[in-house]
């Protein structure tokens, strides 16, 4: 049944259609875009925003700051709640859209306004309580900045979030590039301050385990690398629900590689050579993982290379921000063997471009090697290493 109304040229045209379909039958409709309209952009000017620290000349899509509650539900994007209307809040609650992922950073209203350069940022924290009271699952993120929202402020924030009954909170250290001219003077974490932050998060997480049966608060892997501490065991991370935030990735990969190797028989006949390239931060653990593989396949030569991030500079040392240009510059004179293995997180969704717009074809051509992007799991990594030449 089609019920249409129109008031003439230029007026609003509204159509209501009722359809009937069989049980389990597809409705047969597709939207042109998954959001059906434009993405909502961010209205904040956060003092720690990574996008504000990007160099000029990168592809335009990298400079877009989204802050859209629909993307939170669809893809797990974090939203700040400064760009959401009462109507949208009511709709989320009415439709029980869950989970919602929120960039909290601090529950101190005045400090949140300062950190996000938005005078309304403190007011929107009330939405957290409304969501929690409605039974909406809340996953939270805190970008921790030394001397600003760490220490006692972090304790306050975690206490408030625990009392709200949030599902999970990922705490990650601020990332600083060399492109910070005219930006807020932030300082990076060091060994001492990273260790102090780990102690706070672990202590409060341990208390949550005793009271609620789950940890709730998780420090990013980068904190442990900065503090030069061992990564916790896989059990610490429970269901590994925050891998996309850099929480537990090293423990997950190490454990998953171990399980994969248990399924395979040792094979001394494999005698090819491969290179695996990663960020400087994870390099010691990647060396350890490659040693695990070598124990089972001793005649495979594995060249593990840490790539210094000259493109972003600063303290950026994570694998996902390694660029194609840095790979080419630093591996040009290496004997790379049959294939160069990288994490697929270095590439955009289509797996064809690095952040600096260097393509995978460019890297293969310049280095004369087959480039093999792998996902962050043991099966893909082990198979890529033992496969040899294509």
Would you name each region that the model predicts?
Residues 15-165, 175-204:
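Conserved Radical SAM active-site core
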Residues 8, 165, 366-367:
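Short, structured coil segments at secondary-structure junctions
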Residues 2-13:
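Single conserved hydrophobic/aromatic residue that forms the stacking wall/gate
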Residues 164, 208-212, 294-299:
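Short helix-capping segments at alpha-helix termini
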Residues 103-105, 141-143, 172-174, 220, ...:
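Generic beta-strand/beta-sheet core signal
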Residues 1, 228-390:
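Radical SAM enzyme core and accessory elements
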Residues 99-101, 137-139, 168-170, 216-218, ...:
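Structural preference for beta-strand elements that scaffold enzyme active sites
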């Amino acid at each position: 049944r089609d019920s249409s109304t129109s008031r003439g040229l230029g007026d609003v045209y509204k159509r209501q259609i009722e359809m009937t379909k069989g049980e389990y039958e597809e409705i047969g409709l597709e939207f042109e875009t998954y959001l059906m309209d434009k993405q909502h952009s961010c209205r904040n000017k956060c003092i720690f925003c990574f996008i504000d620290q990007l160099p000029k000349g990168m592809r335009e899509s990298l400079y877009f700051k989204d802050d859209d509650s629909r993307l939170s539900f669809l893809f797990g994007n974090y939203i700040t709640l400064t760009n959401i209307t009462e109507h949208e809040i009511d709709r989320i609650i009415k439709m029980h859209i869950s989970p919602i992922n929120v960039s909290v950073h601090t529950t101190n209203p005045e400090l949140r306004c300062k950190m996000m350069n938005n005078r309304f940022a403190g007011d929107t924290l009330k939405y957290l309580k409304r969501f929690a009271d409605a039974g909406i699952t809340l996953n939270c993120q805190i970008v921790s900045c030394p001397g600003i929202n760490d220490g006692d402020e972090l304790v306050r924030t975690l206490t408030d979030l625990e009392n709200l009954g949030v599902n999970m909170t990922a705490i990650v250290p601020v990332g600083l590039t060399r492109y910070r001219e005219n930006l807020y003077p932030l300082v990076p974490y060091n060994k001492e301050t990273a260790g102090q932050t780990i102690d706070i998060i672990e202590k409060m997480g341990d208390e949550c385990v005793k009271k609620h049966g789950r940890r709730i608060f998780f420090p990013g892997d980068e904190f442990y690398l900065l503090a030069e501490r061992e990564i916790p065991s896989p059990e610490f991370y429970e269901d590994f629900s925050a891998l996309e935030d850099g929480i537990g990735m090293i423990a997950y990969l190490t454990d998953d590689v171990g399980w994969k190797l248990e399924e395979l028989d040792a094979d001394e006949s494999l005698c090819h050579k491969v290179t695996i390239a990663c960020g400087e931060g994870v390099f010691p653990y990647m060396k350890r993982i490659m040693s695990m593989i070598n124990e089972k396949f001793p005649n495979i030569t594995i060249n593990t290379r840490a790539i210094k991030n000259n493109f972003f500079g600063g303290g950026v040392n994570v694998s996902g921000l390694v660029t194609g240009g840095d790979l080419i510059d630093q591996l040009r004179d290496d004997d790379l063997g049959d294939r160069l293995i990288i994490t697929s997180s270095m590439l955009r969704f289509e797996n064809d471009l690095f952040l600096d717009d260097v393509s995978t074809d460019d890297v293969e051509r310049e280095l004369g090697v087959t480039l093999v992007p792998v996902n962050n799991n043991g099966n893909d990594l082990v198979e890529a290493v033992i496969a040899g030449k294509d």
